[in-house]
Amino acid sequence: MRMDPFIMVVIALLVMSSSVVVHAKRVEFSDVSRSDDTSHIIEMIQQINESMLFSFHHGLMQFGPRYTGTASCNLASQYIYDSFQAMGLSVEFYNWKMKGFTSRNVVATLEGIDPNSTAQYILCGHYDTVKAGPGADDDGSGVAAVLAIASVLSHYQFNNTIKFITFSGEEVGTYGSFTYARDASHRGDNIIAVLNMDMIGFANTVEGGRVLRFFPPLRSRWIAEYATTIAEKYQDMLDMTVVTLPSYPGDDSQAFVDYGYDGVWIAHQDGYPYGHSANDTADHLNWTYYTKATKLMLAITAEIAQRPIDVEVMLLRPLEGYLYFFKRPVRQTSFADFWANGMRGRTFIIGGRTMASAEVFSSEPIRYVVFCVDGQFLVWDSDPPYEWRIQGWFYPLIGKHTIEVYAYTTSGKVASDEMDVIILSLSTTYK
């Protein structure tokens, strides 16, 4: 069997490389305080109830199993579209084709009111199922929660934009979220966080009835930390706790992480014995727990979408998921099936000094912007445009590396972003 020369180079570089773990946080907010006025958030939380959730959930369940590409899956997407539209939200189908599947995501948008903010937050779930079952928990629970939260938040205004998205293609390879994340990256969408609710409707222990689990990659742990703070803030009302565990690469948030965004999978704690089967039905859900989990997710979404961002930095170049050859992007890489090893969205740089550029949004003056590789300082820039030609200092960059950028304000606030790259270049600053 002949192998594509590009794939051969990729394999060689991966063999030569070692993994590097870096913790990035693209934004810094003002502190969340228990003394903040919470009356409007409490008002929103109180509007979520079991009857509302049951109504949205039953509407989705009426189509039976919703395997991607089938008529029942398409009918379910129309139901979701009509539900968003009835809320007065801007809504669209996001069509995609991949690996023999043709389907569509449903995207509803609640525009932010801050004219200086391009920030987006995504609250999502997947409406497709396996062939065998109706998917009451996996992931009818997440989709109905998205709809319930959207129905409440649509009556309020927030500084930053919220997108409510239901994906198809999750059970066949997370193809719906992959295509959306890839396209969002190429558009330059300023997505701050992706909150993916996938199986949030079950509890059969006292402890499990009070816990919602967050599975962030290291770079996105700040989301779980923020959610923990919000859970503590509304503890007396909701009796819910956030527990943080290591990430799992098979959910819809991972596609966004692969393309340089922050995201987290959110699920119940107790093991669910009916998953991926004909027994994944509504009568097996714990509706009391499910309602509390949805209320907590509303509070987290509303709090984070309203809070002003003090400083944010984005790595704009090189483009995520491209092959660069002597400083020029020559082709888009295609690793849609490589979700388990982080190859989706990976950027490859061969030869030359490719330009890295960053954009900073800040409510106060920027002191400087620092570019690093694998956690080591290489260059700083005090004036926009913030740019750097990617190269080693004394030695070439060869293999797998992480490019980081840090933006420092005059008051000491810091935001950072990162990009995983595979490089084969002999360029150095000092010969």
Where are these regions (language model features)?
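Acidic/histidine-rich catalytic neighborhood of metal-dependent amide-processing enzymes
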Residues: 130-222, 226, 248-249, 253
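N-terminal hydrophobic or amphipathic helices/low-complexity stretches enriched
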Residues: 24-71, 110-111
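A non-catalytic alpha/beta surface segment that caps or lines the substrate-entry region
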Residues: 55-111, 239-240
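Solvent-exposed loop/turn segments at secondary-structure junctions
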Residues: 66-68, 97-101, 112-116, 127-131, ...
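Long, low-complexity serine/threonine/glycine- and acidic-rich segments characteristic of extracellular
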Residues: 313-430
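Secretory targeting signatures
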Residues: 1-30, 313-318, 405, 421, ...
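Active-site-adjacent substrate-binding region
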Residues: 205-312
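Second-shell loop/turn segments in exported
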Residues: 39-47, 61-72, 93-97, 130-139, ...
